From Swiss-Prot:
Modified residues (N6-(2-hydroxyisobutyryl)lysine): K168
Protein name: Endoplasmin
Compartments, record wording: Endoplasmic reticulum lumen; Sarcoplasmic reticulum lumen; Melanosome
Domain remark text: The SRT pseudosubstrate motif associates with STT3A during translation in normal conditions, preventing glycosylation of facultative sites until HSP90B1 folding is completed.
Motif SRT pseudosubstrate motif: chain residues: 42-44
Biased composition (Basic and acidic residues): 795-804
Residue ranges annotated as motif Prevents secretion from ER: 801-804
Gene behind the chain: Hsp90b1
GO cellular component: cytosol; endoplasmic reticulum; endoplasmic reticulum chaperone complex; endoplasmic reticulum lumen; endoplasmic reticulum membrane; melanosome; midbody; perinuclear region of cytoplasm
Length: 804
């Protein structure tokens, strides 16, 4: 009996050994088993992982099956021209490698669009798989990236035609022209045209690309290529996809970053956030769950409770099962594009809260937008857009103005993000506007990196600017003046300078301080409404501050006669007005320049002419003698009422404010010809004939033209007028000396009197007091040479003993 028992045990052991051997052979013979299957998933819920991987894995073939598959597959060699084009695409047309994922998702979206369209007329089109999704999965262990869609799929013929052939008619001519354009440094975007070759961007990051596809009208096939040749064969596993396509990339070593979940998620959000179909990424998250304790853990815990003197005894029936909190990694599909493109809906159907929520999500801002506009543009190019004005100006708005690219306008084509790297989508002065532009028919070049036809971009730009200005115009006056103008007023002024075609529209948005109100700002429309009956010009005065502008001698008579004067207090203001020739048929008049005239009666005209004749000796004396090289001419002023004189620029010269701004420029070197020309223009010296100083000067000049006091007075008046008119003095020391001389004369002090010399100080006696006391000398001698050296080095003051 014992012998039979031993024999039976041996048989069982032998049988078990054969079974294990068979299992080991089967495992060893499998190469690339479960290609694409993530090992992270297998460490968690096996059933979930198996179910999900069945829909996304490429194959589960063993080594012999893979060898047979590759031996029986039909191989195709890329033609020389196609191979050349492939290299051109990989090396030349794509500016950055990360766009490969955008292209693959875009192709997947196109395939989903096609099957959805087919399903409208064919009720069985979605029978194989009713889902319409894109799924992305990373397999770091096997260096694989999978992109699966449930779109229309491809037949064998379509795999060969669509993925194996890029060549079109005239390919050689196309390549030659492109090569010539590159050698000449010209743009190739016009030559490229619209090729459907975004798929080949996969070779930017992959050594090998494997495509498994199932079409409703054909069996499932596998397409494989290393960019040199490709092969196609029927999938021996049969129909594992149901319908759709899986693209598997065997990534290059330097492209391993694209296996990181964060990298893939960021790329999906960046480029494909608004795709119409849901995009999922197989990702993990850590959850804290409670699990029952094992028996040994429970026993240990009960022992610890028993040993604890402070433990509270619990009744048997109240005891609950022992559990512990455990952190567990859970894998599942995470939706990436949960933000819907609200610009695709009619504006009437979108609530205000939806616009605000979209703006905050889109711009990463916490505040609501100040204004927004949602519109559809039709014509030469059709697109939909939503534009926003932020509540506050972005930080560094004018840093590198004009050279810094604006990334606030994002361009989409069929909800696929193309670029926000623009120099010319919006003009520089509107660099604060944020928004999206989405077009279904915008032509792109092969790499989607640059717009194919720049004229269409100009059409889009033109419409965006018009809509933006309409949006700004509709902002309520109170909000506009209190908020918008403080944040973006400088932008509007720059727009007047830069945008000639929209200058009239922008002029209506301008706001300035004026003499009409001490604090409120005014528009040009409001100024024109308040103009006097026969006033034909808009008067303005520029200064570094309102106080300087309104205290200028140039505005004295204007304010006295009731004319409103606009105050320009910002450095850009005078440039802005100079670029604006007129507004509503009214020309602008700088009151610091020539040309200010008032309506006068015949009697007033006769009085003015008589005054000019009376002061003709003084005017000629100033022009030909006292101020000979300093002024263009001297005239009797019509604009002064309180000040004795003023220095007026010519129509084409610089005002004092403009000269100060130009000389303060960091790049000003003094070598610019035009700058030197404007700066060297002589001014007109206007005098007030009713001022006592001027009348007394006339009397003195008539008595003695060579009177030195009058000569000094004329120069001092000129230099004072230079300062009050906003100009800088070339020699401030000479001006100070003349003022001092005038003060001496007014106090009856001799102009030649010298400053009293300071009394010379007597040199201090450095010798030490000595006495005849022999005992003191003896004590000092006994102090030793060492103490004397110390006293000499420290230069101590004589002690009380020494003084005695």
């Amino acid at each position: 009996m014992r012998v039979l028992w031993v024999l039976g045990l041996c048989c069982v052991l032998l049988t078990f050994g054969f079974v294990r051997a068979d299992d080991e052979v089967d495992v060893d013979g499998t190469v690339e088993e479960d290609l694409g299957k993530s090992r992270e998933g297998s460490r968690t819920d096996d059933e979930v992982v198996q179910r999900e991987e069945e829909a996304i894995q490429l194959d589960g073939l063993n080594a012999s099956q893979i060898r047979e598959l590759r031996e029986k597959s039909e191989k195709f060699a890329f033609q020389a021209e196609v191979n050349r084009m492939m290299k051109l695409i990989i090396n030349s047309l794509y500016k950055n490698k990360e766009i490969f994922l955008r292209e693959l998702i875009s192709n997947a979206s196109d395939a989903l669009d096609k099957i959805r369209l087919i399903s409208l007329t064919d009720e069985n089109a979605l029978a194989g798989n009713e889902e319409l999704t894109v799924k992305i999965k990373c397999d770091r262990e096997k260096n694989l990236l999978h992109v699966t869609d449930t779109g229309v799929g491809m037949t064998r013929e379509e795999l060969v035609k669509n993925l194996g052939t890029i060549a079109k008619s005239g390919t050689s001519e196309f390549l030659n022209k492109m090569t010539e354009a590159q050698e000449d440094g010209q743009s190739t975007s016009e030559l490229i045209g619209q090729f459907g070759v975004g798929f080949y961007s996969a070779f930017l990051v992959a050594d090998k690309v494997i495509v498994t596809s199932k079409h409703n009208n054909d069996t499932q096939h596998i397409w494989e290529s290393d960019s040199n040749e490709f092969s196609v064969i029927a999938d021996p596993r049969g129909n594992t996809l149901g319908r759709g396509t899986t693209i598997t990339l065997v990534l290059k070593e330097e492209a391993s970053d694209y296996l990181e979940l964060d990298t893939i998620k960021n790329l999906v959000r960046k480029y494909s956030q608004f795709i119409n179909f849901p995009i999922y990424v197989w990702s993990s998250k850590t959850e804290t769950v409670e699990e029952p304790l094992e028996e040994d853990e429970t026993a240990q815990e009960e022992k610890e409770e028993a040993d604890d003197e402070a433990a509270v005894e619990e009744e048997e029936e109240e005891k609950k099962p022992k559990t512990k909190k455990v952190e567990k990694t859970v894998w599942d599909w995470e939706l990436m594009n949960d933000i819907k493109p609200i610009w695709q809906r009619p504006s009437k159907e979108v609530e205000e809260d939806e616009y605000k929520a979209f703006y905050k999500s889109f711009s990463k801002e916490s505040d609501d937008p100040m204004a927004y506009i949602h519109f559809t543009a039709e014509g030469e190019v059709t697109f939909k857009s939503i534009l926003f004005v932020p509540t506050s100006a972005p930080r560094g708005l004018f840093d590198e103005y004009g050279s810094k690219k604006s990334d606030y306008i994002k361009l989409y084509v069929r909800r696929v993000f193309i670029t926000d790297d623009f120099h010319d989508m919006m003009p520089k002065y509107l660099n604060f506007v944020k928004g999206v532009v989405d077009s279904d028919d915008l032509p792109l070049n092969v790499s989607r990196e640059t717009l194919q036809q720049h004229k269409l971009l100009k059409v889009i730009r033109k419409k965006l600017v018009r809509k933006t200005l309409d949006m700004i115009k509709k902002i309520a006056d109170e909000k506009y003046n209190d908020t918008f103008w403080k944040e973006f007023g400088t932008n509007i002024k720059l727009g007047v300078i830069e945008d000639h075609s929209n200058r009239t529209r922008l002029a209506k948005l301008l706001r300035f301080q004026s003499s009409h109100h001490s604090t409120d700002i005014t528009s040009l429309d409001q100024y024109v409404e308040r103009m006097k009956e026969k006033q034909d010009k808009i008067y303005f005065m520029a200064g570094s501050s309102r106080k300087e502008a309104e205290s200028s001698p140039f505005v004295e008579r204007l304010l006295k006669k009731g004319y409103e004067v606009i105050y320009l207090t910002e450095p850009v203001d005078e440039y802005c007005i100079q670029a604006l020739p007129e507004f509503d048929g009214k020309r602008f008049q700088n009151v610091a320049k020539e040309g200010v005239k008032f309506d006068e009666s015949e009697k007033s005209k006769e009085s003015r002419e008589a005054t000019e004749k009376e002061f003709e000796p003084l005017l000629n004396w100033m022009k030909d003698k006292a101020l000979k090289d300093k002024i263009e001419k001297a005239v009797v002023s019509q604009r002064l009422t309180e000040s004795p004189c003023a220095l007026v620029a010519s129509q084409y010269g610089w005002s004092g404010n403009m000269e100060r701004i130009m000389k303060a420029q960091a790049y000003q070197t003094g070598k610019d010809i035009s700058t030197n020309y404007y700066a060297s223009q002589k001014k007109t010296f206007e005098i007030n004939p009713r001022h006592p100083l001027i009348r007394d000067m006339l009397r003195r000049v008539k008595e003695d033209e060579d009177d030195k006091t009058v000569m000094d007075l004329a120069v001092v008046l000129f230099e004072t007028a230079t300062l009050r008119s906003g100009y800088l003095l070339p020699d401030t020391k000479a001006y100070g000396d003349r003022i001092e001389r005038m003060l001496r004369l007014s106090l009856n002090i001799d102009p030649e009197a010298q400053v009293e010399e300071e009394p010379e100080e007597e040199p201090e006696d450095t010798t030490e007091d000595t006495t005849d006391d022999s005992e003191q000398d003896e004590e000092e001698t006994d102090a030793g040479a060492e103490e004397e050296e110390e006293e000499q080095e420290t230069e101590k003051e004589p002690t009380e003993k020494d003084e005695l």
